[in-house]
Structures are given as structure tokens and as C-alpha cells.
Regions:
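Charged, amphipathic alpha-helical segments
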Residues: 1-3, 54
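Short aromatic-glycine-(Arg/Gly/Cys) micro-motifs in beta-strand/loop hairpins
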Residues: 6-43, 69-71, 76
Length: 101
């Protein structure tokens, strides 16, 4: 997962799961959700359009997804810029240079 600089753009949408939280992104084929991921430093995933968010909801609830979710548990919302900013400010990502061996 990497921070998406497009989160600075106005507008946008996010996907929320009823019990897992707000979609943060995916890595190695796994979806990450705040707060259940326990990785607030990644902030929230911003979809530029409602259609792109809907495409991802469709994928997450399809047989093509390795662990499909119930479509009833997923909702598309306006992107919460304030919450994204709070998470990435209060929980900055550690630099690889700062990671002890």
C-alpha cells in the first residue's frame, strides 16, 4: 500500500464496510480497512468518482474476489478529507531508515 497523493484533491468517495471500517487500499492481494487494520498511517483510499468506487464494491462482492464480501455490508460515502488528514498527521509512516534491525 502506498499513500495516494490524489487525496489532496477536492471531492471523491470512499468505501465503508459495516464492521471492518473504511477501505484503505490493498497490498499482496489483501484489502485493508480502518480501524480493523490497525494501520492508521495509511489513511483512507479516495476514489475519484462514484463509478470507480462502485466498480470496487462490485469486485469485492463478486466471485472474482478471493474472499467476497456481502454487498449489503458495503456503502459508498463522500471522501472524509478531515479524517484522512488526521490519520496521516497523527500516525506518520516510519521511514525505512528509521526502522531498527
Amino acid at each position: 500500500m502506498a499513500l495516494d497523493r490524489s487525496t489532496d484533491s477536492p471531492g471523491g468517495f470512499q468505501v465503508r464496510h459495516r464492521s471492518l471500517g473504511i477501505f484503505q487500499g490493498s497490498s499482496i492481494g489483501l484489502a485493508f480497512w480502518h480501524p480493523s487494520s490497525h494501520m492508521p498511517e495509511y489513511g483512507l483510499c479516495r476514489f475519484a468518482t462514484r463509478a470507480k468506487a462502485q466498480d470496487y464494491v462490485d469486485f469485492l462482492s463478486s466471485p472474482a474476489c478471493s474472499e467476497p464480501l456481502s454487498r449489503a455490508d458495503l456503502v459508498i460515502e463522500d471522501f472524509d478529507h478531515a479524517e484522512h488528514e488526521r490519520l496521516t498527521t497523527e500516525y506518520p509512516q516510519a521511514s525505512a531508515w528509521e526502522t531498527p534491525l
